[in-house]
Amino acid sequence: MKAKVYVTLKKSVLDPQGKAVQQALAALGFTDVKDVRMGKYIELELNAAADHSVGPKIKTMCEKLLANTVIEEYRFELV
């Protein structure tokens, strides 16, 4: 089983990396891009079979290590 975790800055937090990418895209002529938000993608390969206990474990991993919940939000999917 695999878990895909997506971590992004909260909307209320300034994203300087995203702003730099947006400006670089504009300099390259891609002026249609209104906003860019950068984040992290994490893939976890799990030994566990798909059951109801996996979701809470991934949530705990995110809250304790993978995301800084003060400034970041996360979501995950099990595949």
What residue spans do the PLM features occupy?
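Long, contiguous binding/interaction regions
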Residues: 2-4, 8-41, 56-79
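Amphipathic alpha-helical segments that form the core helices of the histone-fold
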Residues: 42-47
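Helix N-cap motif at beta-to-alpha junctions
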Residues: 48-52
